[in-house]
Amino acid sequence: MTNTMKENSNYDIIDVIIENVTKEWEESMKNNSINKEKWEVPKYSKSEINKAGKIIANPKSSKEDRDNALVILNNWRASHAYPLQVICTNLRRKNPNAIVVQRLKRLESITGKIERFPEMQLYKMQDLGGCRVIVETIDQVYEAVRKYKKSYIKHIFKKENDYIKNPKESGYRSYHMVYKFYSDKKETYNNNMLIEIQFRTKLQHVWATAVEMMGIYTKSNLKASQGDKEILRFFTIVSSIFAIQENMPTCPNTPRFMEDLIPEMKELNEKHKILDILSALKVSIDYTTKLNFKNKNLYYLLILDYIKGKVQIRSFPTSKVELATKVYDNIEKSSTKDVVLVSATSFDTLKFAYPNYFVDISDFIDTLQSIITGYENDLKEDKLIEQQILKKNS
């Protein structure tokens, strides 16, 4: 443990949680049969799961009701780990050059979604388990989508949304597919386990990351279109600028051409200093001695304390995924830190796919500034050519 961690009581709390949960889990493993499943299985009915979602999203719920509901929700969420692992492993095989990562949805995101959409049922929430495929180009996005659709899988296709050709008003761009998991070998998971797959380019990914980081700074859920309207507008405008770079449609209610988009973006940035804020965000990373970067089958707990500028990382082998989900559940209940449980094939992949937990916005800023510089150089060149023509004809 680093000296920083020893001196920081908040980090001590995290370590105590991990130590206590690990002891309980190891004891339960001793008491159970040798062939105990390493993957969590669903234990509750559809009605119990939906009721739990409503209780947790209701601020008037009693502590006892909420605690009982959390047990149900955590089991339902953790049960998605196995279907998610199967689908993401398949995606990695089909897309060896892509960055493929997976995550179980954060409790705060689950409750926030139910609060925003009161009619939503937790049992039918389509992104409790999410897999993200990140590639270089638009063509590679559609090729990855095509390959997965044509593959011989037994999972049941439920829906798709092309937010690249039809961007959201917020500026969000990605290609989504939802499948209902099916297995001949693990029938216990054939129980409406929905997995969402997101296909996106690196440019779309760095935009989404910047939105999330600015949301943390402003303490508003910008990615759900909540917060300062002008800051939201800035990111929508930037998304349209990026869309033009990828030769794709711009976002609704934004100009269609760079000569209109860039001046508006610069005006909003000048007013709110958004790029300066993003550039200034930094954290120090405590990797801890518990990480093993040589192991390619790891689950990572990313624990971000933005106020103190610290991020902790804990790793778990796939054989201990049940322990990882239990630690995840307990940290969410006992700490105010921003925490997520994810899986990636390497640390570099992890860092690129979740840069918001490492506060690395450099790709977003560098790309945007490069586009602006290129646009301004083109304007200067056009003006120079025009002056030369006028001089020649005078």
Stretch-by-stretch model annotation:
Residues 115-126, 302-303, 329-331:
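Short, flexible, solvent-exposed loop/turn segments with mixed acidic/basic and small polar residues
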Residues 148, 154-186:
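Short Gly/Thr-rich strand-loop-strand
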Residues 136-140:
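Helix N-cap motif at beta-to-alpha junctions
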